[in-house]
């Protein structure tokens, strides 16, 4: 009986061995008949779907935005699109990187960069708006100045040590413009945000500045007991200063308790100004592979814009309106064509918003009012930038009125 069992076990073993061997042979034969993708083909496919976006430091709102875009848009199939965020230096360098670096397709830059570069070197940047164009406005970058409690206004910073963020960062570029406009001279330092906050708490610094979309992660870590607050920047807080130029070049903005519960008391706001962060791209020839890749990205990004209205995404996505126009900039052709082809499709992250800043009807009504008011009052016509600022204030007024009406119901 034991011999029979041994024979059976041996037969089973031989059968399994034969099956495994035949299966392995069949698999090898199938692979031989249909070889895998070659190294060169895989390399070509990988490059054909990749687009790069240069951003500032990792704590910048632009980095979080680009990460969100990557997470929503990425499709690693051979015919898909892949977004590669690149950490750059920020400031004017991001725009220079898009303009001059051959491996950079797009970048997140601030609206005033175009004007500032043309002012610095009119010859080099003479036609920059034809070489780098905007895809869409992303969010507002608030000018945030955090100070010790013994500092009450910008004038109190004269001669004191103020951190302008890293050298040539967007914060330094804009802070330089604003402090020069105010005629306030300070002792500058260029620490990163985390180090600057520690030096501010210790009393070594009187203030630190960050220009980015609020809430900013470094400021969000500040505690009430740290003895710090934000400085207001408006005509009421600086009555002896002429803020006309600042109002013409920057948007009115405010920091709220909801953004910074430990820094802004409930029921109050801190007025300031803001720049607009734009997604821009290099204008490759329309028949080139790189232009076609950016056009594919635009289609994927714009088509999925509603997916960014999610609690898992940065709250600043609520400000995005793909159709918003930027004075002084030229719209990237692929983006303009997409918007023209999707006029009836929602182009905001929150399509249920009733106050659409780029609504053609609302904007046209505002422009008609300005023309009639200007001709009847005899006042000097406003510049495009001044009209944009006034329109932003008009939209804010409408928004507040809508809230009051809802509360009264």
Where are the predicted features?
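C-terminal segment of classical bacterial N-terminal signal peptides
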Residues: 19-29
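Pocket-flanking alpha-helical
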Residues: 70-71, 84-126, 197-199, 215-223
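Bilobed "Venus flytrap"/periplasmic-binding protein-like clamshell domains
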Residues: 48-76, 81, 141-202
């Amino acid at each position: 009986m034991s011999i029979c069992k041994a024979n059976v076990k041996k037969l089973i073993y031989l059968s399994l061995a034969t099956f495994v061997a035949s299966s392995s042979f069949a698999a090898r034969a199938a692979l031989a008949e249909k070889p895998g993708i070659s190294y060169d083909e895989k390399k070509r496919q990988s490059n054909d779907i990749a687009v790069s976006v240069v951003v500032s430091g990792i704590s910048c709102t632009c980095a979080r935005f680009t990460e969100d875009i990557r997470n929503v848009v990425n499709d690693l199939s051979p015919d898909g699109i892949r977004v590669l965020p690149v950490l750059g230096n920020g400031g004017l360098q991001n725009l220079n990187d898009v303009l001059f670096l051959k491996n950079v397709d797009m970048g997140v830059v601030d609206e005033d960069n175009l004007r500032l570069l043309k002012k610095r070197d009119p010859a080099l940047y003479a036609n920059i708006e034809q070489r780098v164009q905007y895809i869409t406005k992303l969010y507002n970058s608030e000018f945030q100045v955090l100070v010790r409690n013994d500092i009450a206004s910008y004038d109190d910073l004269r001669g004191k040590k103020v951190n302008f963020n890293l050298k040539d960062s967007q914060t330094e570029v804009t802070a330089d413009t604003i402090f020069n406009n105010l005629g306030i001279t300070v002792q500058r330092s260029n620490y990163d945000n985390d180090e600057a906050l520690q030096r501010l708490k210790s009393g070594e610094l009187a203030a630190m500045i960050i220009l980015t979309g609020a809430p900013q992660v470094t400021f969000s870590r500040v505690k009430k007991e740290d003895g710090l607050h934000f400085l207001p920047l408006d005509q009421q807080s600086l009555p002896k200063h002429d803020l006309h130029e600042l109002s013409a070049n920057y948007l009115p903005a405010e920091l709220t308790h909801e953004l910074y519960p430990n820094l802004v008391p409930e029921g109050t706001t801190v007025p300031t100004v803001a720049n607009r962060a734009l997604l821009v791209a290099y204008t490759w020839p329309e028949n080139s592979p790189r232009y076609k890749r950016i056009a594919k990205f635009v289609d994927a990004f714009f088509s999925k814009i509603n997916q960014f209205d999610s609690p898992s995404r940065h709250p600043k996505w609520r400000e995005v309106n793909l159709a918003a126009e930027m004075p002084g900039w030229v719209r990237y052709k692929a983006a303009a064509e997409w918007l023209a082809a999707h006029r009836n499709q929602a182009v905001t992250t929150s399509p249920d918003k009733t106050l659409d800043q780029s609504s053609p009807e609302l904007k046209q009504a505002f422009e008609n009012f300005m023309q009639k008011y200007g001709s009847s009052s005899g006042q000097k016509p406003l510049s495009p930038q001044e009209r944009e600022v006034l329109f932003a204030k008009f939209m804010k007024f409408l928004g507040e009125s809508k809230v009051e009406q809802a509360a009264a119901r």
